[in-house]
């Protein structure tokens, strides 16, 4: 077993004109590669390019290839893929202006605004009343030319984080927001506990993960009066920092 970073991928002359090396070794020498690459950052174009180069190596099994990884990172692509598979997702639209945010509020009431490419809940905001929260939307639009705008669902009952690995769901958590907060975010006071996911929730999680083509995923699923809603299928599951707290069996 070998470990290498995306920065250690390189083009070199080869028998067919060009070959790819991974940490100095020919890519063809590997049977499979497990991808846990980070695509965020100022150098994201370079990182996507390198991961795509790796995905194009003939005969190499990559878990998971660049197209799957990018779709899992993009909120817009993810919503499109899940909806096309008939899975329950929040009503979603793009917003490039305050007018479009206001129109969404008129249609859905409270809405969530966030960048399509984001992580750890950064710059995810709720606009519950457009007139009162207009400055929040204005600030986000000043930094992101296009925002994901989705209907907001109450989170008082918590949010499920289901981990899917192949056909198994080894770690299932219920995240509960802190008192007075709508955010199911552990870094902002939310708590979490393990629970036994019911069969219908497990099946939905497996279907969503298959639709995305992801091998190892962490799903955020919200229970609503109308049934489950799939918020996100993350290619990097995370474990809510629980490995640094109480030891559990993985």
Q: What positions do the PLM features span?
A:
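C-terminal active-site "lid" helix and adjoining low-complexity regulatory extension at the edge
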Residues: 196, 223-250
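ATP-grasp fold ATP-binding core
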Residues: 82-83, 105-123, 145-155
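Conserved N-proximal alpha/beta basic substrate-recognition cap immediately N-terminal to
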Residues: 1-91
């Amino acid at each position: 077993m070998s470990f290498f970073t995306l920065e250690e991928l390189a083009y070199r002359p080869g028998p067919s004109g060009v070959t790819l090396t991974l940490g100095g070794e020919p890519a063809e020498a590997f049977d499979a590669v497990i991808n846990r690459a980070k695509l965020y950052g100022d150098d994201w174009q370079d990182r996507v390019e390198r991961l795509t180069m790796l995905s194009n190596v003939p005969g190499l099994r990559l878990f998971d290839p660049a197209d799957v990884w990018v779709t899992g990172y993009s909120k817009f692509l993810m919503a499109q893929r899940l909806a096309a598979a008939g899975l329950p997702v929040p009503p979603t639209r793009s917003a490039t202006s305050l007018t479009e945010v206001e129109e969404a509020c008129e249609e859905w009431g409270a809405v969530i605004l966030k960048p399509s490419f984001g992580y750890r809940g950064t710059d995810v905001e709720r606009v519950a009343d457009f007139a009162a929260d207009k400055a929040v939307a204005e600030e986000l639009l000043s930094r992101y030319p296009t925002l994901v705008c989705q209907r907001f669902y109450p989170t008082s009952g918590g949010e499920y984080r289901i981990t899917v690995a192949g056909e198994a769901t080894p770690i299932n958590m219920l995240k509960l927001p802190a008192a007075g907060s709508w955010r199911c975010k552990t870094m902002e006071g939310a708590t979490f506990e393990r629970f036994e996911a019911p069969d219908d929730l497990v099946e939905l999680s497996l279907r969503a993960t298959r639709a995305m083509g992801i091998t190892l995923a962490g799903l955020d699923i919200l229970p609503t009066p109308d049934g489950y809603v799939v918020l996100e299928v993350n290619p990097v599951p995370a474990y809510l920092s629980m490995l640094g707290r109480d030891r559990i069996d993985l």
